């Protein structure tokens, strides 16, 4: 996780977005695939966590809560992580809204991606069998006068402590173990993530949930 803002990332840069055509009594209606899945209460975080992607996820979470505050939201994550502040805006919104947010790791959930995966509703956090999870402490690369560097170092340590305490709460692991295990990059398989408490179950088929 980087405490600085990650570079802007355009979801459209993933390439051509498929369109889905639906028939209705009024004729045909075309949706991009993500809008169609949003109707099914599915949200994607694909790529780095930054202000752009975080704002999109937060807006969709709030929209789906307004649509139906009693139905679960399904949050699919394939992310290498990114900005702590952007990620925390997603985390806080997940905790703030009324619907349960079920998280599912597809591909990878690293750094802030792993943090958000772990933050899903208890019993509703999943990963596909070949996905990877990585946890570590926040990164910082501030340059400047010694006094300013000291200020930023203190802030990084404060953020690290806050993130570790939240992860301990959601995973059920002792804070001391979280601190030890996030001191360096720590890679886990889906099964290891389940054993650790970052997720609740490894899914091999949809009906296994």
From Swiss-Prot:
Give its localization.
Cytoplasm
One BP annotation, GO: protein quality control for misfolded or incompletely synthesized proteins
Catalytic activity, reaction form: Hydrolysis of proteins to small peptides in the presence of ATP and magnesium. alpha-casein is the usual test substrate. In the absence of ATP, only oligopeptides shorter than five residues are hydrolyzed (such as succinyl-Leu-Tyr-|-NHMec, and Leu-Tyr-Leu-|-Tyr-Trp, in which cleavage of the -Tyr-|-Leu- and -Tyr-|-Trp bonds also occurs)
| Predominant place of localization | cytoplasm
A single GO cellular-component term from the record reads: endopeptidase Clp complex
Q: Write down the CDD domains for this protein, in alphabetical order.
A: S14_ClpP_2
Give its E.C. classification number: 3.4.21.92
As for family, the record states: Belongs to the peptidase S14 family.
This one is known as ATP-dependent Clp protease proteolytic subunit
**Protein's organism:** Dechloromonas aromatica (strain RCB)
- Per UniProt, what is the name of the gene that codes for the protein in this document? clpP
């Amino acid at each position: 996780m980087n405490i600085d803002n990650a570079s802007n990332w355009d979801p459209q840069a993933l390439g051509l977005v498929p369109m889905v055509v639906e028939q209705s009594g009024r004729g045909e209606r075309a949706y991009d695939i993500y809008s169609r899945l949003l109707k099914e209460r599915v949200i994607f975080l694909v790529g780095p966590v930054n202000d752009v992607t975080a704002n999109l996820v937060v807006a969709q979470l709030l929209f789906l809560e307004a649509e139906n505050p009693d139905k679960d939201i399904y949050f699919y994550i394939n992310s290498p992580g990114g900005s702590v502040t952007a990620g925390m805006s997603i985390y806080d919104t997940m905790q703030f809204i009324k619907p349960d947010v079920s998280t599912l790791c597809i591909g990878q959930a690293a750094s802030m991606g792993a943090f958000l995966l772990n933050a899903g509703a208890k019993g509703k956090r999943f990963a596909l069998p070949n996905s990877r999870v990585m946890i570590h402490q926040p990164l910082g690369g501030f340059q400047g006068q010694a006094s300013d560097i000291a200020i930023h170092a203190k802030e990084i340590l404060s953020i690290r402590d806050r993130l570790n305490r939240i992860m301990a709460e959601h995973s059920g692991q002792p804070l001391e173990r979280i601190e030890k295990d996030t001191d360096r990059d720590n890679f886990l398989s889906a099964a290891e993530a389940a054993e650790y408490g970052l997720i609740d179950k490894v899914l091999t088929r949809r009906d296994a949930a």
